């Protein structure tokens, strides 16, 4: 059974739900596939569900109850003649905001991450296992997501958000 909430809506008809979690990818994702029509009436979901709408996906069995399996935001809505697909992204969606161009010199990774979270409105704590200092780090025509991706690519770290805490750790290290 399921309970899927998007913005102010609760979805009844669902064709398929795929949830993908991986610390190797920056964000966890969920893909929700919905029928395009019900009782030969077009649902026009793309007019009701918008990018940035909150998404909570509860899945389970009647015997054991529902469990929150995914929480995040609608990243995009796509339609074809058969179905509507909602591509959703976890809390890292909030990092898809443009950040002001900036040049940092001699900045620790933790301080850089603090500056990054402050640039998108703050409210995050940082859990970082790395101690290094960047000689130079540039934000140029980028989003906070782009900056995190660059950090992840450079050091191979596991990067994820958990309860408003941004985690950056070596791949083999188990944290939070």
Indicate residue ranges for each PLM-predicted region.
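Short beta-strand-centered interaction patches in the first periplasmic/extracellular domains
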Residues: 83-85, 89-92, 124-176
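Second-shell loop/turn segments in exported
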Residues: 98-106, 135-138
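Extracytoplasmic/secreted envelope proteins and their assembly/folding machinery
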Residues: 71, 110-113, 145-148
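Glycine-rich, acidic and aromatic/proline-enriched surface loops and short helix-turn segments
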Residues: 77-80, 108-125
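Assembly/oligomerization scaffold segments
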Residues: 1-94
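Generic solvent-exposed, charged/amphipathic alpha-helical segments
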Residues: 56, 113-117, 149-152
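Solvent-exposed, flexible loop/coil residues
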Residues: 15-23, 99, 108, 130
């Amino acid at each position: 059974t399921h309970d899927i909430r998007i913005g102010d809506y609760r979805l009844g008809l669902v064709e398929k739900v795929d949830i993908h979690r991986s610390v190797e990818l920056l964000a966890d994702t969920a893909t929700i596939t919905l029928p395009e029509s019900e009782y030969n009436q077009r649902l026009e979901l793309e007019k009701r569900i918008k990018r940035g709408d909150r998404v909570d996906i509860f899945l389970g069995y009647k015997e054991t109850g529902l469990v929150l399996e995914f929480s995040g935001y609608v990243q995009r809505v796509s339609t074809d003649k058969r179905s509507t697909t909602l591509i959703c992204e976890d809390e890292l969606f909030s990092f898809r905001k443009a950040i002001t161009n900036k040049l940092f010199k001699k900045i620790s990774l933790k301080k850089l991450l603090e500056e990054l979270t402050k640039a998108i409105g703050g409210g995050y704590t940082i859990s970082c296992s790395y101690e290094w200092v960047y000689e130079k780090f540039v934000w140029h025509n980028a989003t906070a997501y782009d900056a995190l991706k660059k950090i992840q690519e450079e050091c191979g770290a596991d990067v994820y958000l958990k309860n408003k805490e941004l985690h950056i750790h070596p791949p083999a290290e188990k944290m939070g």
